[in-house]
Amino acid sequence: MRVLIKNGIVVNADGQAKQDLLIESGIVRQLGTDISPQLPCEEIDASGCYVFPGGVDVHTHFNIDVGIARSCDDFFTGTRAAACGGTTTIIDHMGFGPNGCRLRHQLEVYRGYAAHKAVIDYSFHGVIQHINHAILDEIPMMVEEGLSSFKLYLTYQYKLNDDEVLQALRRLHESGALTTVHPENDAAIASKRAEFIAAGLTAPRYHALSRPLECEAEAIARMINLAQIAGNAPLYIVHLSNGLGLDYLRLARANHQPVWVETCPQYLLLDERSYDTEDGMKFILSPPLRNVREQDKLWCGISDGAIDVVATDHCTFSMAQRLQISKGDFSRCPNGLPGVENRMQLLFSSGVMTGRISPERFVELTSAMPARLFGLWPQKGLLAPGSDGDVVIIDPRQSQQIQHRHLHDNADYSPWEGFTCQGAIVRTLSRGETIFCDGTFTGKAGRGRFLRRKPFVPPVL
């Protein structure tokens, strides 16, 4: 299979140029002006469009069972939506397994979930839900098998205490793995939640009030300090929602500590006023949506380089599930938002087209830095000879309004309903194969490949 993309503006994190791009057998073979292939190939005219590396979303939750519900997107519908939004690689956060289970148990379960369903290439983050000698001994073996990142939780059922966190940080660091963490102070949240429930205050807005930004920021500061105690272990903070936590991360970075951070479109573009709408339960996620002042602080981090990655935390529960389970009580509502299809378009529109970020910075946030941090570079996140032919073509001249009925996930709503975006995803290629074109999904279940990721190597801070 040969594909020649002509006349587009090819953008990588380190620059852009109007040039052609030749893909053969799923691999980028040549970039240059006026490429004339010696053999027949499919030609795609990208005149007036940006040609970006396919998106790498390093934070999804497909087919996750949270105890009270299972998310409504599996690895087919979830990766289909990703493909239609210009994302060609996902790294899924595996959910909690049975009490006391080994790391391998969840890996085998999740490989079974994805094997015959994934449309695009995929990998997984391990999840450490308890610490014992067997788990610590298993970590190096998992890294050898291509899982080079693991997630810890400071809240929820399988939260770790500080001693367990230190043990995990040390062993992961020794084994060549990156520690990722969901940072919220569980005790403070439980106290606030109990206070509201006792007073009969169960409307959606009390979800946000029960998880104030200080709960998140305190946990971020604690993790930074624990990582330092654990021998300057590398640390990745997921789904940052506030500026105080970002200040702590800036300070750590100024002290040359190896810390990185992601945020998500919902924290950049949605705010806490959503909880006071008639459909406020649609927006229950943790950490919760914040106020506009916090949005502005995050945008500063996007613009000045303090934030490294924009991912989605895609975790879809239908409105029907939310209403049936919660019965109007925020504390019973399953957490999470859809968004894997909208990430690239939303950030392009609100970032590149407004002048907040350059096209190169867009690549850094959506594909290049995720690939570097999580052991996929230069196979992913780059358009250069030898890299995978993963491409998203965006036409900046087109304007689109997001409507759920046109999306490809399995949710029954979109938090982005009615958002108007400047710039449209017109084509997605995965390893040279067109899997989305002009509004139509053309991929197939099972074509995605499991990616064995390289051990963690820190990018230059």
UniProtKB/Swiss-Prot annotation:
Annotated positions binding a divalent metal cation 1: H59, H61, K151, D313
Sites of N6-carboxylysine modification: K151
InterPro entries: Amidohydro-rel (IPR006680), D_phenylhydantoinase (IPR023766), Hydantoinase/dihydroPyrase (IPR011778), Metal-dep_hydrolase_composite (IPR011059), Metal_Hydrolase (IPR032466), Metallo-dep_Hydrolases_sf (IPR050378)
Entry EC no(s): 3.5.2.-
Group of enzyme by EC: hydrolase
Alphabetical UniProt keywords: Hydrolase, Metal-binding
Annotated residues for binding of substrate: Y156, S286, N335
Cofactor note: Binds 2 divalent metal cations per subunit.
GO terms of molecular function: hydrolase activity, acting on carbon-nitrogen (but not peptide) bonds, in cyclic amides; metal ion binding
GO biological process: pyrimidine nucleobase catabolic process
Family statement: Belongs to the metallo-dependent hydrolases superfamily. Hydantoinase/dihydropyrimidinase family.
Quaternary structure and partners: Homotetramer.
PANTHER family the UniProt entry points to: COLLAPSIN RESPONSE MEDIATOR PROTEIN, HYDRANTOINASE/DIHYDROPYRIMIDINASE FAMILY MEMBER
Protein known as: D-phenylhydantoinase
